[in-house]
């Protein structure tokens, strides 16, 4: 019978890098599943470049990509302060899988779909709150506020953070966390069916580990796969600020 092992990581943690490498060495999986979609996988291979104006236009939603941009800046800043490149644990999983000739499965939902569903799910008040929260978080990190990265992987801390996020933005939590938990669980169950005697190692963010595990243990709780992949419609006026950026070569978030 196929076996699935899920490693929960912090995205800017040297300990997570070490844990991923150790898990591959000890578990000897037949496939390594990572919490990336093809576009993020390609970006990681390019050393995590910032989204260009063309990328923004391709996503077709300025506000959604701005959220991604702010989150990426915050993650890079934290990574610089703790001496670990953002996404280093995913890179470690990719590098070690390739070194051992282990197939890699990209099991996360298309980032464009996630961002569009996330932004479209928010009401005006939630969007304003989200923007201010991100700006304040960046300001706190820039001011040198210490962050205990490893504590973010402790289950009680994870539960508290997830609960606070759900209170802060219930709709956002559904799109960013719950839907992706279900999507990744669907993908892992499919991999398990394809490899009845295989060993599957999944490398995911610590905040997703419990939700994914619950779905795998109780498949009846899963949302139908098709309903998780629909891309909501966006409005043409969302491109106007982007065209202005393109003409003026302005980058709203410094790298």
PLM features: residue spans?
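Compositional signal for N-terminal targeting/processing segments
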Residues: 1-255
